[in-house]
């Protein structure tokens, strides 16, 4: 089976639309976050069924909860594996600036969340790296190491020096 579009996302559906999928069995395509940025890929569901994903250019990244296929009694949904991340919570704007600058020099991929997010504080989230953890420990910057399903995958930012 070739999937060429995402039909919707379970996390975005209004409650009354979600009810239409209630009786369906959910077959999962379990993907690590890094695979979400690939438009063309082969995947195997948790039932051992192979599928091809061939999304149109510009269609956006896959996300946790994306509905790939719906049949009579079954649906195929993307399930994203948690990513090992460092959740960095600087105490001051100065500490944030110094930390972001130091980590930015490493061309580290990061995401930023405000206090209204699921983190409950303004934080910077980056993929786990032992050298970053060592820097944070030595600099005294508060952080925690967590396993998280991120709303969007880390993506390399193009640049030149």
Curated annotation (Swiss-Prot):
Q: Which UniProt keywords apply?
A: Chaperone, Cytoplasm, Nickel
Please provide the Gene Ontology terms (biological process) for this protein: protein folding
Q: Please give the Pfam families that the UniProt record associates with this protein.
A: UreE_N
Q: Which cysteines are joined by disulfide bonds?
A: none
Localization (cell): Cytoplasm
The UniProt entry, under InterPro entries, shows: UreE, UreE_N, UreE_N_sf
Summarize the protein's role: Involved in urease metallocenter assembly. Binds nickel. Probably functions as a nickel donor during metallocenter assembly.
Question: What is stated as this protein's family in its record?
Answer: Belongs to the UreE family.
> What is the protein name stated in its UniProt record?
Urease accessory protein UreE
Q: What organism is the protein native to?
A: Pseudarthrobacter chlorophenolicus (strain ATCC 700700 / DSM 12829 / CIP 107037 / JCM 12360 / KCTC 9906 / NCIMB 13794 / A6)
